[in-house]
């Protein structure tokens, strides 16, 4: 059961949503915990901002982690379709804790400078090839978890991103086949320590991107058939209620299919792998003067049809 602070956050979540979302029959997969459960369970979010249907209670043979669920492919998805067609008990949102929809993926792939308007913000040319870097999976936290400011950095910044979740293993994937390898989409916050990303560690991006808690995800993995067009979604970020980033995924330079084709030339993609597809303009480092996160700040990252994640900085 949530305490008063948790109830306040729930109210904030519901108030934060600015755009219309898909109806509750859409497939919005979550990982969650509840006081009466022995450990994490898989669930269905009953509409964006709604309660949770416990899929493991509906079908006890289902895996309890998203990666294992995705590895089983169509067999597990058919169970979820049956659950959607059945009147099932819904756990109130106030009684569950949302985890990241995917935890412990094989890899988290990230894409830099992948929004045309973000390139204009930096006064740099649009890349001719995707710029790829990574985060460690240990950076992943849930949609309402805290972001911990590391004492090693004084320049921690925000980046809202559309995240693609892989559902089918593949290597050398053709663009025409790429969407067949996608399970769905979720909201990501690519928290970034700019001093480490841009000035230290030989200007290699990894350390500045992968401090603990630097990859909030959620609230749900929305399956691809529940998203009208992933490349035409409003995307925004607010810090303490102030709009900092506002764009549309139609500004992406390299779309999902191109990114999957490119990345799969170098590495095998596995179910549960996550691809963060880049951020729009409005990040703190390019403001005049620059603005960075501080303790007590609250960051809301929101994408149309997918939902909103809210993380307090501590």
From Swiss-Prot:
Gene Ontology biological-process entries: oxaloacetate metabolic process
Positions where N6-acetyllysine occurs in the chain: 203, 234
Keyword line: Acetylation, Isomerase, Magnesium, Metal-binding, Mitochondrion, Transit peptide
Protein's UniProt keywords contain Magnesium: yes
Coiled-coil regions, chain positions: none
Tree of life domain: Eukaryota
SUPFAM superfamilies, sorted: FAH (SSF56529)
Protein name per Swiss-Prot or TrEMBL: Oxaloacetate tautomerase FAHD2B, mitochondrial
Primary gene name: FAHD2B
């Amino acid at each position: 059961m949530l305490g008063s602070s948790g109830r306040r956050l729930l109210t904030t979540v519901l108030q934060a949503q600015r755009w219309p979302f898909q109806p509750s029959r859409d497939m919005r997969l979550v990982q969650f915990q509840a006081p009466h459960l022995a450990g994490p369970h898989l669930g269905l979010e009953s509409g964006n901002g709604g309660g949770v249907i416990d899929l493991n209670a509906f079908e006890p043979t289902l895996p309890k982690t998203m990666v294992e669920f995705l590895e089983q492919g169509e067999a597990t998805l058919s169970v979820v379709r049956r659950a959607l067609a059945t009147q099932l008990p819904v756990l109130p949102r106030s009684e569950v804790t949302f985890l990241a929809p995917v935890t412990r993926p094989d890899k988290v792939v990230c894409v830099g400078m992948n929004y045309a308007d973000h390139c204009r913000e930096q006064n740099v040319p649009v890349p001719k090839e995707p710029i790829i870097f990574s985060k460690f999976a240990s950076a992943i936290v849930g949609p309402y978890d805290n972001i911990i400011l590391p004492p090693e950095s004084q320049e921690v910044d925000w980046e809202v991103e559309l995240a693609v979740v892989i559902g089918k293993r593949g290597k050398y994937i053709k663009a025409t086949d790429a969407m067949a390898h996608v399970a769905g989409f979720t909201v990501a916050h690519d928290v970034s320590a700019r001093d480490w990303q841009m000035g230290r560690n030989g200007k290699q991006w990894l350390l500045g991107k992968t401090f603990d808690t630097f990859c909030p995800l959620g609230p749900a993995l929305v399956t691809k058939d529940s998203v009208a067009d992933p490349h035409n979604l409003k995307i925004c970020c607010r810090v303490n209620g102030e709009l900092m980033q506002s764009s549309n995924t139609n500004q992406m330079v390299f779309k999902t299919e191109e990114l999957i084709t490119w990345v799969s030339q170098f590495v095998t993609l596995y179910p549960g792998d996550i691809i963060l597809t880049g951020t729009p303009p409005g990040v703190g480092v390019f403001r005049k003067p620059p603005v960075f996160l501080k303790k007590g700040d609250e960051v809301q990252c929101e994408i149309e049809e997918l939902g909103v994640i809210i993380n307090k900085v501590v």
